[in-house]
């Protein structure tokens, strides 16, 4: 199975990236093919509301660094999305990425990606309470669930946790990847 990961943190060694990469380690150990996109290193434009996707039932036609992603998304069995938290919100580049999935709902309101893609959300925040802004993460993930993806798990990390709590979360992340 192909596992596509979209990492949203501008810090490759940051909490959300580290945790997401641990999920991917588990996926690789299970024999899955892994494709990684790092949004902070990509030229990704926001949706321009051109409606080409709706009128022609095609993936987004914008010529930016997301072009290869659409093919990978249609081929994958799992999608891992990770984001850091800025000011109690998913970081901006990941919201832009999320909005681009507008193209996956046709003009007839049918989802244009195969149903059942497994979805894993990985988030990092400064607040030690993982439930403090869970509603924000749920809002973000719901956009993917509205495209018939199935949420497998949601991981929330805080750098303020003791190391043993972080280690347990890293092990949980690995197991999630292993069991995709």
Where are these regions (language model features)?
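Short glycine-rich anion-binding loops that position phosphate/pyrophosphate groups of nucleotides
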Residues: 85-87, 126-127
């Amino acid at each position: 199975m192909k596992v596509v990961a979209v990492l949203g943190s501008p810090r490759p060694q940051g909490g959300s990236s580290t945790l997401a990469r641990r999920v991917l380690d588990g996926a690789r150990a299970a024999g899955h093919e892994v494709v990684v996109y790092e949004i902070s290193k990509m030229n990704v434009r926001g949706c321009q509301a051109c409606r080409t996707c709706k009128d022609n039932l095609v993936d987004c036609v914008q010529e930016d660094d997301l072009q290869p992603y659409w093919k990978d998304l249609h081929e994958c069995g799992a999608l891992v999305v990770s984001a850091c938290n800025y000011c109690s919100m998913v970081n901006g580049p990941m919201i832009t990425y999320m909005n681009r999935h507008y193209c996956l709902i046709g003009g007839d309101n049918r989802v244009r990606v195969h149903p059942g893609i497994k979805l894993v959300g990985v988030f990092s925040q400064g607040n030690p309470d993982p439930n403090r802004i869970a509603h924000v993460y749920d809002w973000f993930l719901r956009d993917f669930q509205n495209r018939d993806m199935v949420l497998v798990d949601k991981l929330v990390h805080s750098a303020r946790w003791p190391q043993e709590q972080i280690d347990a979360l890293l092990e949980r992340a690995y197991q999630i990847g292993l069991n995709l």
